[in-house]
């Protein structure tokens, strides 16, 4: 790991210990499974967008004080396939309360929320599910082979999708192997019962996606050229997400041509006066290029 991820992992483990002291895992797990099943992630038309809510970015600083309910409502109205919500408190000013508010707001739109944080333990997936989340981000560099398998197994048990995040070709190889071990692959022939926590699984309703983050973890600068450089390493059986540095419709068109089916957009939408309009324009550009 890098220094930034080391610090984030250490802070995450400290919060995990505090959470364990407040609520035993057995109680939390029961609460998670008692929470109504969230909407599934539905990918349409060859190119999709995950919109992100965060109050702060380590590289850009504070992103404003937008109220979460109208902001995520605009994301859904613009056509976002899912909404990513930061829950990390120190660097991103996020919380589980933000996640729960977004989930409650978006249920009426049929749009799932995903927990974005520096997750290191299944307990944190139970927290997310109990807050109403339908998905979560897993960072492959923060997890051992065994831990990644444990996390993907837990997510599958909870009926949650995962975005497994990579930063380079070696990460992509590890992430893809971990997804293959822990999640059914996104195949049109693959189905699961709809009557329990499992999903109808196909490429349009994936259990797992591969995320590629173009941020340099030493400097926190974005390096968009990495999307093209890593395109040949992308697994064709998984939907792939371009993360960080996506700010314009042209960016969406470019990564769509490189083979990415999804973009995750955060800061640009948090700063936009009309986020729904920005999402529509980005989706149109990506779908025209895909």
Predicted regions span which residues?
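Catalytic cores of alpha/beta
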Residues: 120-132, 168-183, 236, 242, ...
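Glycine-rich phosphate-binding active-site loops on the catalytic face of alpha/beta enzymes
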Residues: 81, 85-87, 130-147, 209-219, ...
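N-terminal active-site wall of soluble small-molecule enzyme domains
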Residues: 48, 53, 59-163, 169-174, ...
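Glycine-enriched alpha-helix->loop->beta-strand junction motifs that scaffold or abut catalytic
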Residues: 79-80, 105-109, 130-136, 156-161, ...
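An N-cap/entry alpha-helix motif that binds or orients negatively charged groups
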Residues: 1-66
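Catalytic alpha/beta core domains of metabolic enzymes, predominantly
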Residues: 183-208, 216-218, 223-250, 266
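Conserved, mostly hydrophobic/aromatic
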Residues: 8, 51, 75, 128, ...
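C-terminal helical cap(s) of enzyme catalytic domains, especially alpha/beta-barrels
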Residues: 230-233, 256, 269-290
């Amino acid at each position: 790991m890098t220094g930034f991820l080391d610090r984030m992992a250490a802070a995450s483990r400290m919060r995990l210990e505090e959470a364990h002291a407040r609520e035993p895992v057995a109680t939390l797990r029961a609460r998670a499974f008692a929470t109504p099943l969230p909407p599934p992630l539905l990918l349409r038309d060859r190119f999709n967008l995950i919109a992100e809510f965060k109050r702060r970015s380590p590289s850009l600083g504070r992103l404003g004080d937008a109220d979460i309910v109208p902001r995520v409502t605009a994301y859904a109205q613009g056509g976002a396939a899912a909404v990513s919500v930061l829950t990390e408190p120190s660097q991103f000013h996020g919380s589980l309360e933000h996640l729960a508010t977004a989930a409650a707001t978006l249920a009426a739109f049929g749009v799932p929320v995903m927990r974005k944080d520096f997750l290191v333990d299944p307990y944190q997936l139970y927290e997310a599910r109990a807050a109403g989340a339908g998905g979560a981000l897993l960072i492959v560099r923060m997890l051992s082979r065994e831990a990644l398998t444990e996390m993907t197994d837990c997510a599958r048990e909870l009926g949650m999708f995962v975005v497994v995040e990579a930063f380079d070709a070696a990460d992509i190889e590890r992430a893809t192997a971990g997804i293959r071990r822990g999640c059914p692959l996104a195949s049109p022939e693959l189905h699961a019962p709809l009557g329990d926590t499992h999903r109808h699984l196909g490429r349009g309703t994936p259990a797992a996606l591969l995320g590629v983050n173009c941020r340099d973890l030493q400097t926190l600068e974005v390096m968009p050229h990495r999307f093209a450089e890593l395109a040949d390493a992308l697994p064709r059986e998984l939907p792939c997400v371009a993360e960080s540095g996506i700010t314009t419709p042209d960016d969406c068109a470019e990564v769509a041509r490189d083979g990415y089916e999804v973009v995750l957009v955060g800061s640009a939408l948090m700063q936009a006066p009309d986020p729904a309009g920005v999402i529509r324009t980005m989706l149109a550009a990506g779908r025209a290029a895909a």
